[in-house]
Amino acid sequence: IRRPPRSTPKPSSAASDVYKRQHIERLMILGNIMLLLEIDPKKVNKWFMELFIDSYDWVMVPNIFGMSQFADGGLMSTKPYISSSNYIQRMSNYAKGNWSKIWDSLYWQFIANHESKLVSNPRMSLMVNIYRKKTNQDKMEIKLLSESFKESIF
């Protein structure tokens, strides 16, 4: 999902910047979208291990399976590290746009897909209840947009 930045970022002076990302970028941007897309956590781990030069099993395995992809059933983290586009907008220079509609549809569809598990999670039950209050029309639009986006990239 690409969106022009609000301001022009300074060009990087280090070629290695491509292969390094700060932890929060990995967790809350890359990991977030991969979880919202419901990509197999083993594939997510493989991708991170192959792409980043500072990837080590002792760091990546707990970060991917325990935090980023919530694949350990909540042993390490109390909630999935997912967010709506609002978080991305607050933490970056990305403005609201078509990308945010797609991101939000993926977010709400993830909540719908895992509603029965998330409703008993104290940190996620509010979002489940917000989803439940959406109209049937809104839910259908969320589902259609999230499915069409997934089909366009897989």
Which residue stretches match the model-derived regions?
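Single conserved hydrophobic/aromatic residue that forms the stacking wall/gate
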Residues: 1-15, 19
